[in-house]
């Protein structure tokens, strides 16, 4: 078996997907921060070994947790700044697209993390025969998405030719 041939639009898909991955990393980091904030100040469980443990060990763990918490907050700030820059870049390219349906497909799926059925409903849900031909409209949504990727690739290449 041969490896799947890369498509010319893969560079755009990767750019758009990287935004979603970054959002997920930010969400996960926020959860880690919340967890550490809850546990950093709480006393640790008593040792049942019978061996005395000094308060030095406890404060050392608390210090490590507080340091880790500060590092995560700095990391979160950096990721949030990167997310804002990436979103701005993507939104600027979307603004240059001429077809509103293409814009909506890209915005909903990649920026809003909507699934394809939700995108299809947004684009075609007002059609009188939508419920009857939902699968056809979903396929039409995929075609619009493919066309949108081609349009974004052209815009991306034009913007990066200047750099």
Language-model-derived ranges and their functions:
Residues 1-96, 124-128, 143-146, 150-163:
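N-terminal interaction/assembly modules
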Residues 113-137:
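Helix-turn-helix DNA-binding module
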Residues 98-114, 118:
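Short amphipathic alpha helix immediately N-terminal
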